Amino acid sequence: MRHADPYRSEELARNVAAALRFKKSQGTKAMPQVEREVLAACYDRARGGNFHLANNARDQGWAHPGMYLRDAFPDRVDVMEEVIAEGDRVGLLFRVTATHTGPFFGIPPTGRRIDVHEIAWLRLKDGQLIEGWFMMDELALLKQLGVRLPLRVDGGIVAPPLAAGGEDIDACVQRLAAQPDELANNQIIVAESRATHAGSGRAPEHRSMRNGFTHLRAYSLAAGHGELALDSAIPDRHDRVEVMMAEGDTVWMRFNTGGTHGGSLAGIPATGRKVGVPVTMIARFVDGRWVESWTFADELGLLLQLGQPDVVL
């Protein structure tokens, strides 16, 4: 587990400890007591990790395990990879590892192992969690289980609402520019990179550890559709910043990207539909130079909005 700043303040360290205690208790006998202690009465689970699977399973009468998924994956172990904290926020990046041995949102047990990423954005007040926002790599999960999105009785699919909120890039940069310090400078570099989608601001030796639309990119190449060209497929694409965190040498940014599907996307013909999904980016700096990034987009959400949830499965 990598901490963005292992020498963070006592207050931030307390927030991190509460967040990790909450996460590590899930599915254990200690969970009910831990939740009573670390979840505020006003706690808002703004987004669940399996957001799309849960939404599409709603009202179908399928047996499903509920919030913590332990009935479907009883040997689940979450492997923490990254931790960041700033102000009242804590971010956790972890891998969900488990064996699928129980019903899961309409998917019968497969006996297969999974190892997928999930990210959590948490807010705390007085040492308790008041908000949780989670996103799991649901496409990777379905691919590893070897299944498609379960069919609903009505034959339909439940697409997510357009993620279109957040702060304009220019406004975000101007706000950060009023805080002249290294952390703000790093955030400015990351925010400005979303103005053109051209990868500006990265050092020559920059490494991309994960592309945001990694599954669509791989599918597009494998299916003979060439490199994934989001800007051609969504020519009016624009991004808006939901939240940023900076600590030590690391910047986290959650933003919404969207527009009109006006061109071919990995072989999906233009639909004219409006799309908009959340994306998380983790950027690492050395001496003010952006040297590494890891990006994770809600690809299943995008495909649901296009009416093509199974195209890469």
Kindly give the residue locations of the regions a language model identified.
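C-terminal and inter-domain tail/linker signature
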Residues: M1-L313
